[in-house]
Amino acid sequence: MQLKIQLLMLVLMTVLTDVYSKDGFIVSKKNCLYRCSQSDERGFCNAVCLRYDADSGYCRTGKCWCDGLPQKANIAMKNKSYC
């Protein structure tokens, strides 16, 4: 019985984490994307993303991509242009 409860809690925590976080290219307060170099092995982008309360970040196609951002975070939309 104890094992079943622990497994249920694990599943619920996983589902809730996915629901309450999002991933994407982070947009600054000035409505700009953070540019980066592909050779930046998680350094700059990870630091930027952590400032926005993300789990981690890395350089993807020359822009900072953040994983595990809070729902309130401003991420880039496909049909919008940024500075």
UniProtKB/Swiss-Prot annotation:
Residues in coiled coil: none
LCN-type CS-alpha/beta domain residues: 22-83
Assigned keywords, A-Z: Disulfide bond, Ion channel impairing toxin, Neurotoxin, Secreted, Signal, Toxin, Voltage-gated sodium channel impairing toxin
UniProt keyword annotation of Disulfide bond present: yes
Any one GO molecular-function label of the UniProt entry: sodium channel inhibitor activity
Domain of life: Eukaryota
PROSITE patterns: LCN_CSAB
Gene3D superfamilies from the UniProt entry: Knottin, scorpion toxin-like (3.30.30.10)
A single GO BP: defense response
Disulfide bonds: 32-83, 36-59, 45-64, 49-66
Leader sequence residues: 1-21
Protein localization: Secreted
Record-level GO cellular component terms: extracellular region
Tissue expression remark: Expressed by the venom gland.
Comment, domains: Has the structural arrangement of an alpha-helix connected to antiparallel beta-sheets by disulfide bonds (CS-alpha/beta).
Family stated for the protein in its record: Belongs to the long (4 C-C) scorpion toxin superfamily. Sodium channel inhibitor family. Alpha subfamily.
Role, per record: Binds voltage-independently at site-3 of voltage-gated sodium channels (Nav) and inhibits the inactivation of the activated channels, thereby blocking neuronal transmission.
Protein's recorded name: Neurotoxin LmNaTx35.1
Biological source species: Lychas mucronatus
